Amino acid sequence: MEISESAERKAWDQWIFLILTMESITELNNKTQGQLLGGNDLALFQSILLTAFSDWIPVIEAVKLLFIELKDRKKQMKYSEKNCLYCYYVPLTTPEVSTIFAGYGINLIGNTAFLSYRAERYPQQSLSDKIASMCMQILISNDHAAEAQEVCKRLKEYRCRGYLTGMFSNDRWIGGNQKDIARLIEKESGYPVFFLEMDFWDSNNL
């Protein structure tokens, strides 16, 4: 099946707009230390990036509306400092995690799994080039030092009490690196890292 250049361009523009709007929502929530979206709300919202849709227009419109509503809510809320942890990935499939922390007055914000950073730029002639460039900028697909450095920046920027990671002991690709990165974060930032030894997909071992 051939896809026209105009269709490719339209799809790319829609995707970029969605990504930028979602990043704006996440940053807004992070700056309020999770007082706009709870950990489970954040996880559900970010699951859009893991979902396939036949038509992105309704999704984009819903995300745009959410951004407007959250900005309005922020204007009306009385701000106060909250205890929060920056999280590798708030586990959407085990909502008990966020609920337990919330019960102790700790908000979960983040997530590192969706962060990107500035990588070396290459010529982007086609849609495939653009997608490849985007993949190269995914933080968790790069080296440990880069991931730890970016996390440290956010711990300071959002005035977090520490970093919450783990939850992927069942995954050799993701889980195998987490303890090394956790040590780097503690060494570089001085922030405590809390490590949950559990299965991201299964709450039975909480």
Predicted feature descriptions by range:
Residues 1, 22, 77, 134-136, ...:
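Detector for methionine-enriched segments
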Residues 141:
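Short acidic-aromatic active-site loops that bind/stabilize oxyanions
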Residues 1-120:
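A charged, amphipathic alpha-helical module
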Residues 100-112, 124-130, 137, 145-206:
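Hydrophobic alpha/beta core scaffold segments
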Residues 81-84, 130-138:
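Short, flexible active-site loops
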